[in-house]
Design a protein with these regions (language model features):
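Short, compositionally biased serine/threonine- and acidic-rich segments at solvent-exposed termini, linkers
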Residues: 164-166, 322-325
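Surface-exposed, glycine-biased beta-strand/turn segments
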Residues: 17-90, 94-100, 107-112, 134-136, ...
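Exoplasmic/lumenal beta-rich domain surfaces
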Residues: 100-135, 216-223, 260-324
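Catalytic-site microenvironment of enzymes
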Residues: 16, 188, 323, 327
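Bacterial Sec-dependent N-terminal signal peptides
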Residues: 1-27
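Short loop/turn motifs enriched for small/polar and acidic residues
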Residues: 165-167, 279-280
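Histidine-centered divalent metal-coordination motifs
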Residues: 105, 159-165
Length: 327
């Protein structure tokens, strides 16, 4: 039986650094800002939401609607959707470099496009519409005014939801990988650390139930302190953590989490890309029963068999479970 379980955690800042785990090269100066105000974020990429990951950035619009939204790069309007839920009024622009930018919760589209959409709504005699366009219908140049920001659909307040997707696969990428400004010198905060016995032969302090082990933060070193436990068998860990950003009071999802045990990396995952169809696996990443009970999303630092997420940067066989040896 191991008397003391020691684990080392590294929580990266929100900003995706140049040495990010992703193997794909992202253009850093291709896409411009979709707004003409300094960018500040209300929500970041792959934040954990109810039953899904957040697919983009929520950009603040100073608490109001009607800010001009601009095409981030040359391309053409490929699709318009209008709905009373979800993204509300949303525009998709395809670009020649293989990416699609998405602009959601819009108040209205630029006049020529707005006129076309209204005519289609009258023709179909319904509000909710989805219209696809040819490259020659509504071509745009970088910086063209294409819409006004709003609060439509499932939005809880005025903002612009902005995404960058792969045009072919529709997988979403972290927009911060494309060079958007993001001043962040505040480390993420850890609110809880949980130890879980995995399997019938495992126990923590003699009990087959999870145990909260976080005691608090050392003010002198900024390190987090944990209680001493005894454990046997296979142990998993989970962490409740949120990130902060310079200049805002918002809380954000962390960009990367790594688990190290005795100098060896046991598990690591990074939110660079959101694969289409993987949202249902979110609830395998978190302690779902605890979330239902308390609303806190404790993220597992071990991989359960039913977890098919592609976010992991460590090999499949490295599942993050710690085998406690006698001694």
């Amino acid at each position: 039986m191991l008397r003391f379980l020691i684990a080392f955690f590294s929580f990266s800042l929100l900003y995706a650094q140049q040495q990010a785990a992703s193997q794909r090269e992202f253009p850093k100066d291709y896409f411009g800002s979709p707004l003409d105000i300094p960018l500040s974020y209300a929500g970041n990429f792959c934040e954990l939401r109810p039953n899904h990951f957040h697919g983009g950035l929520d950009i603040k619009t100073d608490g109001k609607e009607g800010l001009k939204v601009y095409a981030a790069a040359e391309g053409f309007v490929s699709c318009i959707k209008v709905s009373t839920y979800g993204y509300g009024k949303v525009m998709y622009i395809d670009h020649p470099n293989g990416y699609t930018t998405v602009y959601a919760h819009l108040q209205k589209f630029a006049p020529e496009i707005e006129k076309f959409v209204k005519e289609r709504q009258y023709l179909l005699e319904k509000y909710d519409v989805e219209i696809e366009f040819k490259p020659t219908d509504f071509p745009v140049k970088k910086g063209d005014w294409v819409a006004l920001s709003g609060n439509t659909g499932g939005s809880a307040g005025p903002h612009l939801h902005y995404e960058i997707r792969d045009t072919q696969t529709t997988n979403a990428y972290n927009p911060l990988l494309f060079g958007y400004p993001n001043e962040d010198d505040i480390a993420p905060l850890v609110y809880n650390l949980v130890a879980y016995p995995i399997g019938e032969e495992s126990a923590i302090d003699g009990m087959q139930e999870e145990r909260n082990v976080l005691l608090g933060k050392d003010k002198n070193t900024d390190e987090y302190l944990t209680s001493k436990i005894t454990a046997q068998g296979r142990i998993g860990l989970g962490v409740y953590t949120l990130d902060k950003m310079t200049g805002t009071r918002n809380s954000y999802g962390v960009y990367k989490i790594s688990l190290w045990v005795n100098g060896s990396e046991k598990l690591s995952y990074t939110f660079d890309e959101l694969i289409k169809g993987e949202d249902p696996y979110l609830n395998t990443l978190i302690d779902y029963p605890l979330y239902v009970k308390t609303g806190a999303r404790v993220q597992h630092l071990y991989r359960e068999p039913q977890n098919k997420l592609s976010i992991y940067t460590t090999p499949q066989e490295s599942d993050g479970i710690i085998q406690v040896e006698d001694g």
